[in-house]
UniProtKB/Swiss-Prot annotation:
Sequence repeats: 339-446, 455-561
The protein's name in its UniProt record: Vinculin
Pfam family, one: Vinculin
Subunit details: May interact with sorb-1.
Biased amino acid composition, Pro residues: 866-887
Keywords: Actin-binding, Cell adhesion, Cell junction, Cell membrane, Cytoplasm, Cytoskeleton, Membrane, Repeat
Organism in which the protein naturally occurs: Caenorhabditis elegans
Entry membrane topology: Peripheral membrane protein
A molecular-function term among this protein's GO annotations: structural constituent of cytoskeleton
Regions of compositional bias (Polar residues) in chain numbering: 817-830
């Protein structure tokens, strides 16, 4: 039962909401007279005038700015509250209790209680308001050309009408028998039916609006598919004339849609796809023009490369449009769902295959269609998508899909041969292929093999290993910390994937680091195998198993620290210079036509560019999978950009070859060159976001010292070329550090931090040119010792400036290079807490200067301060009697005791309780003392566990269920308020934005939770519910539907709160020093949870 919040239909729903409020008012006034009821009726606005004003509320023009909102789905952007949403007001209007929720409680409390008053007057007004709603709905159906809307909307309208009749029947029954229990139940069922029917009505309308946008997108896809068969300039002009207005409509419609979505991820995907389309469209047209010019009147050198560029851009445009179509149809966003997830990849592939099915069937149905046409390519691409699904499906599904792919490919090859030779299709190959395609992709009557594989993969479910090394390390440590917990092998699988990633990283390292990393992996695998063997034999809690667990924990932490260090080194080396290979390639492309080595130089520079791109994309993927970042957004951005760089590299080489032999195609080459350069810079930026800035600066300093040693060797050997290369690398690394410092300063609003970093950056900026100039002087005269000494002095100053930048960014001076930085990161993760300062008063101290402060775990400790003299013994006095201690309330102890009574269930049996446990496991590492965010989040986890009990009918009443959901909403409001307050005081712009984005969804989800809980309360204990046409039906199906939506909403809420806590903990280290905000993040020792 999705609940929507739309401006479009607000005027239609408002009368229904208002009239149901008056029904409630009359239900609560047992002594109300008929005159008072009539008085209430006369105070209402004129419903007929209201209906006429709302008659066109469902028009396309108005609805485009008022897309509805779902319970679990993507929603309009504004935060939902009780005052703005008429549907919410049906459940939770202004006042102590909501309309339907209050009726539920009245029904529950009225066993043999007070009599109900005469409700025929207000119920009659409800009927008239519902009648206006139904009239507008039917008018919308009559004027729409959407057959699905015309099919789905009438049952929803009939359901609302049937529920309204139930209200009328209940009011007449209560008029004759004020104590009638069945009449009271009809009253509740009628109100609930109106709500559910109205929600179904709005769902139909919103899906119709989405289909309108999708139709425009598919029309654009049809035009793009034609681009591969255009062979004349006249056809190209007509193509541009036809596709331009379609792309304009797509841009406008998608832009209006994304503005009203609440999910930041969905908005960003739509914006990114539209930006890509705006960039690709002119490049596609230019590549089409180039391919036509090089192919007319006969193909010239570079024609094949131009066609490859055109086809690539056409495919890119199609993929971006398919991604828009996919996101437009999304109704939920699961924060735990990664783009590399098998289910997500399968869903994308199925959506893309369905979009190609019509073109494929049209080609098969046309006996005169040529081989190589758009339809045949559609069949080939469907097979590619099917193969992608089979690679991720269950074994039995994969086998069926592969068999179908083989049959379709064989039939298509035979059919192409027949048509190329002009022979008829006597064996009905086209019909057989069409039937196989429908069986594979699905049709109106069947889900198809690909759809079945997707459903089975979703049903197989279970938790998947994390997608980053940090996440897998966390899963493995959680498995080791909970020996009695059956995680289905998740922890062991995460551990093995972690070591597999480490071995991939080892291939990129020098022999010394490679051997150490491989040795760590071998030790971990050996210990894991021993532990798994002990658990299989039932000895998982033996002393030997505990000893192995401790060894594994230490080895895993060492592995994580070592991977982070060597990965940062790889980023420093591979991304130090991203422009030189590209610059040299461009120079090779523009070489003099009469240069005899022109072709060979182009091949060499192309190979160097390809190798450099492969090195960067490989390192970037390792950063995404093995790096310290847990941010889904950052990791996905790295993977997406790395794939684009990898795809664009051969296209840039093709465009360069075209330009090499055809100087007139300069614009075509510049278009792809610019796109490739932009992708490179984006990739470097995303990689920089994924690694620690302080670690990067320290690693850069170490690399610069290594190149300094190479320069010393070049000076001693009078190697001018080696000196120039190594000193240039030092300068490049210095510029990288300078760019990083400038980014850090731009991202902060803390005046002292910005000033400190900018001063260090200015010092570094001034130190680079002297070092480079002195290196040039040595290169001109390698035996000039005076110039060598000058170079050493300027280079030392440069290295000191780099260290000063690292000190300014981290806030901690490093005396021993980068080693201290890693020691600091280790100490931050340790549970050690320094003892509180002594309460004794220091009366006298011998005069001695204090020593330099010692840096330890970000605390400054002064040593060698003599202890104060021992005070005299106290005089014996008779102290007054000690008052009795006040009763203490230990919230942490109460929380621990609560979760001991609620053990972790199987997620498939009690998913709401499992979601509450998931949040609790995230929060139990933090103390709630002096941290209101953690305290409120812990209350939410406990309340959600209680709500799980209530919705399963395990004790409590309907009133308890409704009140519990309201308490959860109140706690979520507190979490959001505190998170927004913290975000306003955060000086880090990126952290502040991330915190605001993850917290903006909580109020909407919490409001929806109250609505769903009320709907669930109306179904508890009910044998029957109201069917689509007002008839009573068995309630199992609708009750299951309501329960599933409530479960999904609860899971989203718990996940959102967990994300807010993580973002708040990260943002807390960057709050304004003069804010006065007190928010302690005190990590609890593990033993305190037992």
């Amino acid at each position: 039962m999705p609940v929507f919040h739309t401006k479009t239909i607000e005027n239609i729903l408002e009368p229904v909401a208002q009239q149901l409020h008056y029904v409630l008012a009359m239900a609560e006034k047992n002594a109300t007279s008929v005159d008072e009821v009539r008085h209430l009726g006369t105070s209402m606005p004129n419903l007929d005038r209201f209906a006429s004003r709302s008659a066109l509320a469902l028009s396309r023009a108005s609805s485009r700015r008022s897309i509805p909102e779902y319970i679990t789905p993507d929603t309009v952007r504004h935060v939902v509250n009780d005052d703005d949403c008429p549907v919410c007001q049906l459940m939770m209007p202004r006042g102590k209790d909501g309309c339907v929720s209050r009726l539920v409680i009245l029904h529950e409390e009225a066993n043999d209680g007070n009599a109900m008053p005469d409700l025929t007057g207000p119920v009659g007004m409800v009927s008239r308001a519902v009648g206006n709603l139904i009239q507008v709905g039917y008018d919308t159906c009559d004027h729409s050309d959407d057959r699905i809307l015309q099919q789905d909307m009438p049952p929803a309208l009939q359901r609302v009408e049937g529920s309204s009749k139930l209200l009328e029947e209940s009011s007449y029954s209560l008029k004759h028998d004020p104590y009638s229990v069945p009449a009271r139940k009809k009253l509740i069922d009628g109100a609930r039916g109106i709500l559910q029917g109205t929600s179904a009505l709005l769902l139909c309308f919103d899906e119709s609006e989405v289909r309108k946008i999708i139709r425009v997108c598919r029309k654009a896809n049809d035009y793009v598919a034609v681009s591969e068969v255009i062979e004349s300039m006249a056809d190209l002009q007509q193509f541009v004339k036809d596709i331009s207005p379609v792309l304009h409509d797509v841009t406008n419609d998608v832009n209006l849609r994304q503005q009203e979505l609440t999910h930041q991820v969905h908005r960003e995907i739509l914006i990114r796809c539209m930006d890509s389309i705006k960039v690709i469209a002119p490049i596609l047209i230019c590549s089409m023009k180039t391919s036509i010019e090089l192919g007319t009147p006969h193909p010239r050198q570079g024609h094949a490369e131009a066609i490859a560029n055109r086809n690539f851009m056409s495919q890119r445009m199609t993929e971006e449009m398919n991604e828009i179509i996919r996101v437009l149809q999304l109704t939920t966003y699961d924060e735990d769902e990664w783009d590399a997830d098998n289910v997500t990849v399968m869903r994308k592939a199925l959506s893309a295959a369905k979009s190609l099915l019509t073109a494929a069937l049209d080609w098969l149905a046309d006996p005169h269609a040529r081989s190589g046409a758009v339809g045949e390519k559609a069949i080939r691409r469907i097979c590619e998508y099917a193969d992608r699904i089979s690679a991720r499906a269950l074994p039995e599904d994969a086998q069926s899909i592969k068999r179908s792919i083989f049959e379709i490919t064989s039939f298509t090859d035979e059919l192409c041969n027949l048509r190329n030779n002009g022979q008829p299709d006597r064996e009905n190959l086209a019909a057989q292929t069409a039937r196989r395609l429908k069986d594979l992709v699905g049709s109106q009557n069947s889900s198809g093999l690909m759809g079945d594989a997707l459903q089975n993969a979703q049903r197989h479910g279970g938790a998947n290993p994390a997608h980053t090394a940090a996440g897998r390390l966390e899963q493995a440590l959680r498995w080791l910390d909970n020996p009695g917990l059956d995680d289905g092998g998740l922890g062991l699988q995460a551990l093995r994937l972690l070591t597999a990633d480490a071995r991939k990283l080892a291939d990129r390292l020098n022999p010394q680091d490679r051997n150490r990393l491989l040795g760590l992996c071998s030790d971990i695998d050996r210990l894991a195998a021993q532990l798994a063997d002990l658990e299989r034999r039932g000895l998982g809690n033996s002393p030997e198993a505990h000893q192995i667990r401790n060894q594994l924990k230490n080895a895993l932490r060492d592995l994580g620290d070592f991977m982070r260090r060597v990965l940062t080194d790889r980023v420093v080396d591979d991304f130090a210079d991203i422009t030189t290979p590209l610059k040299q390639f461009v120079e090779a492309v523009h070489a003099d036509p009469y240069d005899p080595n022109r072709e060979q130089n182009f091949v060499d520079k192309s190979q160097r560019l390809t190798d450099h791109s492969q090195s960067m994309t490989t390192t970037a993927r390792l950063v995404a999978s093995c790096g310290p970042s847990k941010s889904k957004k950052t990791v996905e951005a790295i993977l997406d950009t790395a794939e684009k760089v990898e795809q664009l590299t051969p296209q840039l080489v093709n465009a360069g070859r075209v330009r090499l032999h055809n100087p007139g195609s300069e614009q075509h080459f510049e278009n792809i060159h610019k796109q490739y350069a932009d992708a490179l810079h984006r990739l470097r930026s995303h990689v920089d976001d994924a690694i620690d800035t302080g670690e990067f600066v320290r690693a850069s300093e170490t690399a610069m010292r290594r190149y300094t040693n190479h320069c010393e060797g070049a000076i001693n050997g009078a190697d001018a070329h080696g000196l120039v290369n190594n000193s240039s690398q030092i300068a490049r690394l210095g510029n990288r550090v300078l760019m990083t410092a400038q980014n850090e300063a731009d991202n902060s609003e803390e005046p002292s931090f910005v000033s400190r970093v900018r001063n260090a950056a200015d010092q570094l900026h001034n130190a680079i040119p002297p070092m480079v100039n002195n290196a040039k002087q040595i290169a001109q005269n390698p035996h000039d010792q005076y110039a060598a000494q000058n170079w050493r002095g300027t280079n030392d100053h440069l290295l000191n400036s780099v260290r000063a930048v690292g000190d300014a960014i981290t806030g901690v001076p490093m005396s021993n290079g980068r080693h201290s930085s890693y020691q600091e990161s280790i100490s931050r993760a340790s549970p050690y807490n320094p003892p509180p300062p002594s309460s004794q008063v220091i009366r006298s101290v011998n005069a001695s200067p204090p020593t330099a402060p010692i840096i330890h775990n970000k605390m400054i400790i002064r040593e060698d301060i003599p202890a104060p003299p021992r005070p005299p013994p106290p005089v014996e006095l008779s102290p007054p009697p000690r008052p009795p201690p006040p009763p203490e309330y230990d919230e942490e102890e109460e929380t621990r005791a609560f979760w001991e009574r609620y053990p972790l269930p199987q997620a498939s049996h009690q998913p709401m309780l499992a979601a509450a446990h998931n949040l609790h496991n995230e929060l139990k590492q933090w103390s709630s003392q002096e941290n209101d965010i953690v305290a409120a989040a812990k209350r939410m986890a406990i309340l959600m566990a209680r709500l799980s009990q209530l919705v399963r009918g395990e004790g409590g009443t309907k009133k308890d269920l409704i009140n519990c959901s309201k308490a959860i909403a109140d706690s979520s409001e507190e979490v959001t308020r505190l998170a927004v307050q913290l975000a306003r005081l955060c000086t880090d712009i990126k952290m502040r934005t991330a915190l605001l984005q993850v917290s903006e969804r909580i109020p909407t989800i919490a409001t929806q939770l109250k609505v769903l809980s009320t709907v669930k309360a109306t179904m508890l204990g009910s044998a029957n519910v109201i069917g689509p046409y007002g008839q009573p039906v068995e309630g199992s199906e609708e009750d299951d539907e309501a329960m599933q939506q409530l479960v999904h909403n609860a899971q989203n809420l718990m996940q959102s709160v967990k994300d807010v806590v993580r973002a708040a903990e990260a943002a807390s280290i960057k709050i304004r020093t003069n804010s006065g905000l007190r928010l302690r993040w005190l990590r609890k020792p593990m033993w305190s949870n037992f």
